[in-house]
Regions:
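Carbohydrate-binding surfaces of carbohydrate-active enzymes
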Residues: 34-36, 42-52, 56-59, 295, ...
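Conserved, mostly hydrophobic/aromatic
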Residues: 57, 104, 197, 291, ...
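Beta-sheet entry/capping signal
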Residues: 64-66, 99, 106, 116, ...
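Aromatic- and carboxylate-enriched substrate-binding clefts and catalytic-loop regions
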Residues: 70-72, 82, 110, 297-558, ...
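Short, glycine-/Ser/Thr-/acidic-enriched flexible segments
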Residues: 72, 114, 202-204, 211-213, ...
């Protein structure tokens, strides 16, 4: 959100006040509390009739500093994310100011004017970032609404990454990003998985601890700063020291949660019914028979929306017209060595039998007038399960347990983004704006808990679309609704790499694209990319993604890359275990793995799969691909040719049966 009109002026209707000095600094030995008036105090009269900000600095974990800025403490503030809590800082106040030390991170607040709050890495003697003149602000808008913002310095050449799954440029400098979950597809500025956490090329990260709307201006309003703002009377953020990006991810996921281990079978190929196609048990069997006849390895089969009766989503009951024997079909799929997944969402259609039950028991979200909140987008008259009500959560979970006991192994937890933020009342009184992004965490956690309780630890896996901070602990997530084109394939990868820098260790996407029907070339190129992702799923909207629907070569490509992925299983499972223990993702942006290589900083069309496999998907019809081979010794997976690179760009042409795939020595 922009508040200024150039450096000197403010946008019409906004009144800004900034922290001008650290007037009074106090400590209890573990934290600092600062009174930061919005004018320089030169006489006793200056302390009157003017707002002052209260700034508290503490440390919840080693190497992490928490800064809380408050105007009026008496105003109810939104709760933050569920973060690990501690109090490990060592603070002192001297004549020159206040200092808080936590591990190798040091926070320095200068006494007096001008306002200066700095973050230093003492292991390297490097100033990471800081807040200075006109940086820490309290503003009122034209409608009287209050906002708080902070601006942290950007150094020369400093790059910013992350902020969740974003499909635009991988490097976020110059962008405006509103952290607000939305069902916008992969070709817009909106995102399904918004995470108010960014990672800097200078070896630190910043988390804004607010589940509501957080607006970022990354060198886009004040070009030498990252600005983040929230509505209300309080703003809290955490600065996380590295010194490497991987160290930052370890510390961040130590606070916000690390991915759980997913079952080995989930790394294999998933096939689905697709969305609006017509299917029944005979159709499902024909697909699976087709894979078996062609010797195509398959790990899981997914039933999309129409396993339930139309107009009744979500009733969690099999449609007896198409699946009269659900226990039987699930058992028969298991006998064939397949695991099973079904589609769900947290919306209850008016025609669903669950609607009347949920309304009667108070399990559905209410409006301020006490009515059940409803609308007609998606399914007619749909309501929303209120997961802030523990009884509603248990009610929903019991319905899911029935399905797991029938033989369902996984759930595709679709949607979770279209959550109203005005005119509704949650059972626990949570601010509706805060619940908009946070809802997905409650939804996915409720489902994940059922799978873990019923199947055992390490055997739960979701296929989730929406997320926020903490969502990384409930894998797997997929990239949402893309289209069947090379351009969409590339934007899908950008979203996945961006998400990876928020500690999301596992990720998938719809091979061939969701909307439309890919031409055979796009499908075959996407197969190679999809089967060299952590998780792999064949899924579409109005057309199926069985490879023989395209051409015989697609069958060969499916066989080749599925077998390749299966051969990598020990390697992938080890990378998954690393993600679960450290927060370092399986699919790694080049900037994460090659920090000192400036040529790697912007790369978003290639990645490392685990620590040692470089993958460069092909995004062209003729098979031409340009990619960067970092310094080191690399061996071509296909030819065994060994290359000693000094850091070089390569141009290759690949058929559908290959792509640049290089193994790092060691």
């Amino acid at each position: 959100m922009k508040f200024t009109n150039g450096f000197w002026q403010t946008r019409a209707g906004f009144t800004p006040l900034f922290a001008q000095e650290a007037y009074d600094i106090r400590t209890d030995g573990t934290s600092l509390e600062v009174i930061a008036p919005t004018r320089v105090i030169q006489g006793r009269g200056d302390v009157l009739n003017r707002p002052a900000l209260t700034v508290t600095v503490s440390s919840p974990a080693e190497g992490v500093a928490r800064v809380r800025i408050e105007h009026w403490r008496g105003t109810a503030s939104r709760p933050g994310f569920e973060l690990a809590e501690g109090d490990v800082g060592a603070a002192e106040v001297t004549e020159s100011g206040g200092v808080l030390r936590t591990g190798d991170l040091e926070v320095r607040i200068r006494q007096g004017a001008p306002w200066s709050l700095e973050f230093w890495d003492t292991s390297t003697g490097t100033r990471l970032t800081g807040s200075g003149h006109k940086a820490q602000g309290y503003l009122t808008g034209p409608d009287g609404a209050a906002y708080l913002h902070e601006q942290l310095d950007l150094g020369v050449g400093e790059l910013v990454y992350g902020l969740g799954e974003r499909f635009g440029p991988f490097v976020k400098n110059g962008q405006t990003v509103d952290v607000w979950n939305a069902d916008g597809g992969t070709s817009s500025e909106q995102a399904y998985k918004n995470v108010p956490f960014y990672l800097s090329s200078r070896g630190y990260g910043v988390l804004v601890n607010d589940p509501g709307l957080v607006s970022f201006e990354i060198g886009s309003e004040a070009v030498e700063r990252v600005q983040f703002s929230v509505g209300g009377e309080a703003l809290e953020y955490l600065v996380i020291q590295g010194p490497t990006k991987k160290d930052v991810l370890r510390r961040y996921t130590g606070l916000a949660g690390r991915p759980s281990v997913v079952p080995a079978w989930s790394y294999g190929l998933w096939l689905t019914t697709s969305f609006t196609t017509s299917y029944d048990e005979e159709t499902v069997n024909s697909f699976i028979d087709g894979f078996a006849e062609r010797e195509l390895p398959l790990s899981a089969f997914h039933f999309d929306c129409f396993w339930m009766r139309e107009f009744q989503w979500t009733d969690l009951e099999w449609d007896p017209r198409t699946f009269p024997d659900p226990e039987g079909i699930l058992a028969r799929l298991h006998e064939r060595g397949l695991h099973t997944c079904v589609w769900i969402n947290p919306y209850i259609a008016q025609a669903s039998p669950l609607f009347a039950e949920g309304r009667e028991k108070g399990y559905l979200l209410r409006t301020a007038s006490g009515d059940v909140w409803q609308w007609d987008m998606w399914v007619a008259g749909m309501a929303l399960i209120d997961f802030t009500n523990p009884e509603a959560t248990s009610w929903f979970q019991e319905k899911l347990r029935v399905l797991v006991r029938q033989g369902v192994d996984s759930f595709k937890t679709d949607f979770g983004e279209r959550i109203p933020s005005e005119g509704v009342v949650w059972a626990d009184g949570t601010d509706p704006e805060a619940m908009h992004n946070w809802y997905t965490q409650l939804y996915n956690r409720a489902v994940h808990e059922v799978l873990e309780q019923e199947l055992g630890e390490g055997r739960a896996v979701l296929f989730a679309r929406s997320a926020t901070v903490g969502g990384q602990s409930l894998p797997v997530h997929w990239g949402g609704d893309n289209t069947s084109s090379y351009v969409s394939m590339a934007e899908t990868l950008r979203g996945g790499l961006s998400l990876a820098l928020g500690g999301f260790g596992f990720w998938a996407h719809d091979i061939g694209g969701f909307e439309g029907t890919p031409d055979p070339g796009v499908f075959k190129r996407w197969l190679a990319f999809g089967l060299l992702s952590s998780h792999s799923r064949l899924h579409g909207s109005s057309s199926v993604r069985v490879p023989w629907a395209f051409d015989e070569e697609a069958v060969e490509v499916t066989r080749l890359f599925t077998r390749l992925k299966l051969s990598l299983m020990p390697y992938l499972f080890a990378a998954g275990a690393e993600a679960a223990s450290t927060g370092v993702p399986i699919m790694r942006p080049m900037a994460l793995e090659f920090e000192d290589d400036r040529s790697a900083a912007h790369l978003d069309t290639q990645y490392l799969l685990g620590h040692d496999l470089l993958v460069a998907p092909v995004f062209t019809e003729d098979g031409t691909v340009e990619f960067y081979l970092p310094r080191g010794t690399w061996t071509s997976w296909w030819t065994g040719e060994r290359t000693v690179s000094t850091g070089e760009w390569r141009r290759e042409v690949h058929g559908f049966d290959s792509l640049p795939l290089y193994v790092r020595e060691g």
